[in-house]
Amino acid sequence: TGPQTXXQAA
């Protein structure tokens, strides 16, 4: 739910 997930760019 955002531009980053687990330090990875979506």
Curated annotation (Swiss-Prot):
Keywords: Secreted, Toxin. Signal peptide: none annotated. Its main location: secreted. GO terms for cellular component: extracellular region. Coiled coil: none annotated. One of its GO terms (molecular function) is toxin activity. This is Toxin To35. Expressed by the venom gland. It is found in: Secreted.
